[in-house]
Amino acid sequence: MANQGQRVSWGDESTKIRGRSNSRGRKSNNIPLSFFNPITLQQGSKFWNLCPRDFVPKGIGNRDQQIGYWNRQTRYRMVKGQRKELPERWFFYYLGTGPHADAKFKDKLDGVVWVAKDGAMNKPTTLGSRGANNESKALKFDGKVPGEFQLEVNQSRDNSRSRSQSRSRSRNRSQSRGRQQSNNKKDDSVEQAVLAALKKLGVDTEKQQQRSCSKSKERSNSKTRDTTPKNENKHTWKRTAGKGDVTRFYGARSSSANFGDSDLVANGSSAKHYPQLAECVPSVSSILFGSYWTSKEDGDQIEVTFTHKYHLPKDDPKTEQFLQQINAYARPSEVAKEQRKRKSRSKSAERSEQEVVPDALIENYTDVFDDTQVEMIDEVTN
């Protein structure tokens, strides 16, 4: 029966022209959110020529529901009043969901590319779309991903918002700086007149200021708290790494203490990536209740050994940083070379950021994957 749907079979397909038509699309300001992170397409490439016909992300739905479409999102940024085109992003939606929820499988729509796994049912799924408070999922596929496709990773919405607010604050500061300078001149003349009047009355303002400063320093010194870890008279396994060389407490790097490159060992908790590395370490309760423990006598002490296995997400940048620290002492030249590469990439990224300084009030782009904040144009142009 037609309303029951049919199994998808690509056996009769001979072309890759999918999801293109001559009709004009409409702008939409209320686009449902995709379950997955988007794909950013390399500029100059055509998504429909590169996308495999079974290019359905893994992780949601049953076998019958592995069917849907990729929806194009055109983007731009305003730079000094000029529109600067940005690479397209493509979001995946299951059949019967998203901005084209009423479309049938293989309907010709601008900015839409239909995909399905062999054996999926060509009827609307009941999977819906992502809630605004839920994070989008990382893209994973069974087959090979075209080189022109960049699979995006999650970025913090709070970070994006804070960058926008920071730009706004910076602009406000620059606008008010001129007013402040003119006001300061008036304030200086008033201050000079007051000081002259006090001097005539025999009040020594300089000595009073000096006494006030000395009292402030005394108060600040008394409130300063020493944050250096107290490691004296503690067992090695109870010590805490502070700022500075950790070999004082844990010894030089070796086969039995093989974590940390020269920078991390020399700087301890003040090393640049220490907070990210610490996030990859299990908690005390995980070690206590999720480890295999053994013990044996060692003279007048007991030697305790535990084995703990856990998994880190492969696509998390912190995981790569963490893995580079394992056995780093045994390959110092390789580690130094990799660190130079990272610094070079970081400087290149900073330069590219400085080249484009968008106006936060007219910017129509966000690096947080929220489709509702970006203009959608369904028309495909060659």
Swiss-Prot record:
Keyword terms: ADP-ribosylation, Host Golgi apparatus, Host nucleus, Phosphoprotein, Ribonucleoprotein, RNA-binding, Transcription, Transcription regulation, Viral nucleoprotein, Virion
The region called Disordered is annotated at 1-29, 150-240, 329-358
Residue ranges for the region (Dimerization) are 231-334
Q: Please give the residue positions where the record annotates the modification Phosphoserine.
A: 9, 156, 254, 256
Ranges for domain CoV N NTD: 31-153
Q: Where is the composition biased (Basic and acidic residues)?
A: 201-235
Pfam families hit by this protein = CoV_nucleocap
- What region holds the CoV N CTD domain? 224-337
One GO term in the molecular function aspect is: RNA binding
The known PTMs are summarized as: ADP-ribosylated. The ADP-ribosylation is retained in the virion during infection.
* Compositionally biased tracts (Basic residues): 17-27, 164-176
Question: Region (RNA-binding): which ranges?
Answer: 33-159
Instruction: Please provide, in alphabetical order, the Gene Ontology terms of the cellular component aspect for this entry.
Output: host cell endoplasmic reticulum-Golgi intermediate compartment; host cell Golgi apparatus; host cell nucleolus; ribonucleoprotein complex; viral nucleocapsid
Q: Does this entry carry the keyword RNA-binding?
A: yes
Where, subcellularly, is it found?
A: Virion; Host endoplasmic reticulum-Golgi intermediate compartment; Host Golgi apparatus; Host nucleus, Host nucleolus
Comp. bias (Low complexity): 154-163
The record's comment on protein family reads: Belongs to the alphacoronavirus nucleocapsid protein family.
Q: What quaternary structure, including any partners, is listed in this protein's UniProt entry?
A: Homooligomer. Both monomeric and oligomeric forms interact with RNA. Interacts with protein M. Interacts with NSP3; this interaction serves to tether the genome to the newly translated replicase-transcriptase complex at a very early stage of infection.
State the protein's purpose: Packages the positive strand viral genome RNA into a helical ribonucleocapsid (RNP) and plays a fundamental role during virion assembly through its interactions with the viral genome and membrane protein M. Plays an important role in enhancing the efficiency of subgenomic viral RNA transcription as well as viral replication.
Tell me the protein's name.
Nucleoprotein
